[in-house]
Each structure stands twice: as structure tokens, then as C-alpha cells.
Amino acid sequence: MKIGILSQFPELYSTRRLVAACESRGHEAVVINTLNCYMNINSIKPSIHYQGQELTGFDAIIPRIHASVTFYGCAVVRQFEMMGVFAANDSISIARSRDKLRALQLLSRKGIGMPITGFANKPNDIPDLINMVGGAPLVIKLLEGTQGIGVVLAETKTAAESVIEAFLGLKANIMLQEYIKESNGSDIRCFVVGDKVVASMKRQGPEGDFRSNLHLGGCGEKVKITPKERKMAVAAVKAMGLVVAGVDILRSNRGPLILEVNSAPGIEGIEQTTGISVTEPIVEYIEKMVLAQKSNRPVIA
């Protein structure tokens, strides 16, 4: 097969590992910078061009769309879909998961546990919003933030009001979430492919920081997840319509809570922490789906 890897960063560990996984299974892997693609949108033969040439002959793509280019990246993925190319994560699912508020609403609809979350537009709604999520301490998040950036822990009601007013004054979209103190600055990252959790790790934030993101200096360690956590992770991915995703879970006194579903999860941290390849299952899943697509038969993922 000919598999395109949509990534702005060919030198990244994640990109290199995906290329290696494709090639080790006998496939041709082509890294395509998403932002350098341009599209011919028509009703007869939609196409994508890249560096002056039309992209043809692709059986599948693996989107690694950076959050900062979600709109254009989803347009490129959608164009590949219109050309009949299988996408490991389709454009609609990526867009769903990137809209943090919409993602939480979808999880809520499916009855999947998550931290109590509040969202408002007007400053005079702030006091009631704070009470709604259980009062201080509480977490304030920018909807557009990624990798722990734009996430603030407000220890008191006064601090929360000040931060919220400042964000709203900048016309920023924010949401409030209850603070799960018992998680102690840690979470569980589950790497899901299809209907399986192929690897999982516990992430612990640096001392004094409640955020567990590895990009912010957190560390990872192997962890054994419970059957309930495994089931919740897969259910959360399905709620988004994704195939490949990272699911972040908080362990709380009332059970596991889904924090986020990431459509382009980091690969380096979880592979180096667990010693498990997460890229091979991705390619294996693509093989199964493309074969089924070509033979026009249903697949049991």
C-alpha cells in the first residue's frame, strides 16, 4: 500500500516511527506537509496537489494534524476522503475532538464520566458558574489551549474570579472544571487503536504543578489500568468517531473520569515509557480497513 503521513514535522519521533512501521510491513510511506497541500475542488475529479504535482495512488493517510492548523488540516483530510482515500482519523472526528466543549458534550451525551464542567459568556454569571463546579479550588481552561498551556488552577474564589474576568476581558473562550485533588497532579494516558487500548502510562506532573503533560516536564511510568478504565477509554474514542487517539483519565474518589481525547497523541513518551510499539497496531488497523474497503465487506475492528 501507499500510505501518506500528514505531518508538518518529518523529523519528529512520531513521524519517523510511523514511517518505520509502514515500511517494516512492506508499504510505501510518504510524509506530506499538510500546509503545503493545495486542493482542486470540483464535482468530477477532486484532487490534491503538492510541490507542483498531483498526489495520486494513495490507499490511506495517517493524519497528524497540529492543533494550530486544525481548520486547514481537516480540509486536506476531507479532500483525501472525497478522493476515496481511507483516513485513519476522518476530518469530522478530528474537528469534534479539537473542540473541547463539543467533545465534553459528546461524552456527556454518552454518559461517560468526566469532571463537572461549566461554560459561560457573561461576567455576571461567574459566581454561579464557580458554585456549579463545586467552588474553589477549580481549574480554568482556555478552549484553544494544548499540551497544558492555558490551564490555570485557581486556589480561591477570589483568584478564580480575577482569572476568569481577565480571560473574558480578552474575549477568550474558557471553561471551568472541578479540581480533582485526589489525582495529585497525575493522570493516565491510554493509547487507543480501534477498539483496543494498546498501551497506557501514568503521567505525573513536576513537583508543585498539577498539570501532568510530559511537554511541561512531567514524567511517565508504566501502569496497569482497570477493566473499567479500559472500557471508558475505548468508549470515549468511539464517542468522537476516532480510530487512533490518546485518552487522558483522572482517577477520582468516584471512579475514573475522562479529561480529554487527543486525535494526534504523542508517540515518543508512551513508547519509551512502556516499551510497546503503538505505531504497528495503527498500520495493522489500516491494512484491515483498506482491504475491507476494497472488497466492500464489513470489518470487525
From Swiss-Prot:
SUPFAM superfamilies: Glutathione synthetase ATP-binding domain-like (SSF56059). Its cofactor is Mg(2+); Mn(2+). Residues 104-287 form the ATP-grasp domain. It comes from the Bacteria. Transmembrane segments: none annotated. Mn(2+) 1 binds at residues 248, 260. It is an enzyme of class 6 (ligase). Gene3D superfamilies: 3.40.50.20, ATP-grasp fold, A domain, ATP-grasp fold, B domain. Its EC number is 6.3.2.-. Mg(2+) 2 binds at residues 260, 262. GO terms for cellular component: cytoplasm. The keyword ATP-binding applies. PROSITE patterns: ATP_GRASP. ATP binds at residues 141, 178-179, 187, 211-213. GO terms for biological process: protein modification process; SOS response; translation. Binds 2 magnesium or manganese ions per subunit. Belongs to the RimK family. This is Probable alpha-L-glutamate ligase 1.
